[in-house]
Regions:
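Conserved core of the PLP fold type I
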Residues: 147-281, 293-294, 299-310, 462
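Conserved core segment of the aminotransferase class I/II
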Residues: 315-379
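Short beta-strand
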Residues: 66-68, 399-404, 438
């Protein structure tokens, strides 16, 4: 059962952890079974008891083992024995509220936007003229009172039904209505999850760079973020596993479709492997999927959602806010029914429940012509992306990551980094972009919102990017 440790292959205690985990997964150690004594394990691994204790303590902190005073260490029967695959022990914690905190750079952007010739490629919304033309229903007060009777703790029932039908038809989702909670946008959904899942000071792994670093809600909940680099297929799982072991990661947040800010799409294999890794360590996944509606390719050719691979251990966050503008915040969470009820309770306690007016308006979005309107938006975005990629093909300095959907493009270069001084100078000269250091990583990259470009603005964009290239090469 136990193999001698190879001291040349990394920390001894981590190799011990891996062997114990594999024996649990293979069934050599059953749920509730007592492990050999520390002395016997030290002899089996040919190491000292101090190293054994460290490995066992780490596994206890991860929830894999339990300790009984005077009796030894046991495989966690609650987590590993009750279900065929380990399910997450979701916990309730309802505390702080979320308040947005603006930084100095965003304040400069706000001031610069008052100038008529300012090219705003920083903002996170599409321009109003691209938003679908939705006709909202007119209701009398008596009708509103009648509709209000259809409100549940999970949301306005007709809206819940529409979202369920849409996700089932478009993305082949399979879930019951009691597994969906309507929220005030995607950010509130994430906030509720953090409040229910984590304790103050807990660690969360995110992709790096990531827009999650821009959200003040992590500060509000006392969450510590650990950035995990990405390669062409998505989040680096080898580095993620080391971070789970070292930093006691309690949740993994990913943005797998048209990742913000890079626009990358996580490969199907990487999604499968991510689920396996997080099952191994009993770490829940939060899948933030607010851009999947804006794919430039057919759904059949896109990777399946991470949630569909492991519905019990993955929480899925979706949103209509990108398509309705910042004034109409609509989002949802899909997950295990017991957790959804707890999230609904938290939402109610914190008075975050949505008004009936907003939910009726959102329900109107899912009319029969919605698919056609959404297709029009996608076509317009794809045309704009082609303008940008055509510009990129002529570049010797800037590179643009391939654009497959969404409305963000990630522009990189070799050489000098985008300092705060250069970014400020660009704003002063009429160009607003989002530098990589806003997303938790100081790399040579900027995010641009290409939905705000057109033929005329591309000319201005090309000129100002040429000026930026000069500053970066100076």
């Amino acid at each position: 059962m136990w193999k001698e440790i190879d001291k040349t292959k990394g920390p001894i205690y981590r190799q011990m952890m891996d062997q114990i985990m594999k024996n649990i997964e293979n069934g050599n150690l059953a749920p509730g079974e007592r492990l050999p004594s520390e002395r016997k394990l030290a002899a089996a691994f040919r190491t000292n008891r101090t190293t054994v204790v460290r490995a066992l303590d780490e596994l206890r902190d991860l929830g894999v083992l339990t300790s009984r005073q005077g009796s030894g260490r046991y495989v966690n029967q609650t987590e590993w024995g009750k279900f065929s695959v380990p399910r997450i022990n979701w916990r309730e914690l309802f505390s702080q509220r979320y308040e947005q905190v603006d930084d100095w750079y965003e304040e400069r952007i706000k001031e610069a936007k008052k100038q008529p010739d300012f090219l705003d490629l920083f903002s996170s919304e599409m321009p109003n003229k691209l938003l679908p033309d939705v006709q909202f229903p007119a209701h009398t007060m008596a009708e509103m009172i009648t509709e209000e009777q259809k409100m549940t703790d999970l949301g306005y029932l007709p809206l819940v039904e529409k979202i369920e039908g849409y996700l089932s038809d478009e993305f082949q989702f399979d879930f019951s209505r009691t597994q969906l909670l309507v929220t005030v946008g995607g950010q509130q959904a994430i906030f509720l999850i953090l409040q229910t899942l984590l304790s103050n000071g807990d660690a969360v792994a995110v992709e790096s760079p990531s827009f999650f670093y821009r959200l003040a809600l992590f500060r509000a909940t006392g969450t510590r973020l650990f950035g995990i680099p990405m390669d062409d297929e998505g989040i680096d799982l080898a580095i993620l596993e080391k971070s789970i072991q070292k930093n006691k990661i309690k949740a993994v947040l990913v943005n797998p479709n048209f990742q913000n800010p890079t626009g990358k799409v996580m490969s199907q294999k990487r999604r499968n492997d991510l689920v396996v890794l997080c099952r191994k360590y009993q770490v829940p996944i939060v899948e933030d999927d607010v851009f999947s509606d804006l794919s430039f390719q057919e759904v059949e050719k896109s990777p399946v959602s991470i949630h569909s691979l492991d519905p019990e251990n993955v929480l899925y966050v979706g949103s209509l806010s990108r398509l309705l503008g910042k004034t109409t915040k609509i989002g949802w969470i899909i997950g295990p029914q017991t957790l959804i009820f707890k999230l609904a309770k938290a939402q109610k306690m914190m008075e975050f429940s949505m008004s009936i007016f907003t939910q009726i308006a959102a329900t109107a979005v899912f009319e029969e012509s919605y698919d056609a309107k959404l297709a029009l938006v996608r076509n317009q975005l794809q045309e704009k992306s082609l303008l940008l990629q055509k510009w990129a093909q002529k570049q010797n300095f800037f590179n643009v990551w391939p654009i497959k959907g969404g409305y963000y493009a990630w522009v990189t270069w070799e050489g000098k980094k985008m300092t705060a001084e250069i970014a400020s100078e660009a704003v002063a000269k009429g160009l607003g972009v989002a530098p990589s250091w806003l997303f938790g990583r100081e790399t040579n990259g900027i995010r641009i919102n290409f939905s705000r470009l057109d033929q005329d603005r591309m000319i201005v964009f090309a000129k100002r990017m040429e000026e930026l290239a000069g500053w970066l090469q100076a």
